[in-house]
Amino acid sequence: MKTFRYVSGLPEKIKLEKFEVDGKRTYILPSGKHVPSITTVLGHFKKASIAQWRNRVGAEEANRVSSKAAGRGTRYHNMVERYLENQPLEKVITESTMPDLREMFKIAQPTIDRIDNIHYVECPLFSEVLGIAGRCDLIAELDGKLSIIDHKTSTKEKKEDW
């Protein structure tokens, strides 16, 4: 198993206060400016297609699929975090780990193993200029290049033009 290294001596992560306004996540930047989350901004572009999908499959099925996807994402993120914390593989993938998550992790593991020199985990990011904020899963080196990394668990490949 790979041992991940963490970079020491970095500044403390900035803490951004977040709250909901009309069901939309908003952050308060260090300057005091209130900005929407990047997820909220991007969500405006998806609303029509999500509404069409919900109408096509029905509310009950849409809620079931959405709930399953959210749960899978949370469990997968927890697995990856344990792995990046250098926990033994048997603590990352346990007997209770669902088969789909086992498979997802096994597929992703070679890519995850290309990560090193971890700077931050679950890190807030923001732009005063763009007026947005959010969180990334990881700031670390991927193949030796400092990168912003966000773990994705979609079961469908996204089109390049999305």
Residue ranges and their predicted role:
Residues 1-133:
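Metal-dependent nuclease catalytic cores that hydrolyze phosphodiester bonds in DNA/RNA
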Residues 119-162:
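Mg2+/Mn2+-dependent nuclease catalytic core
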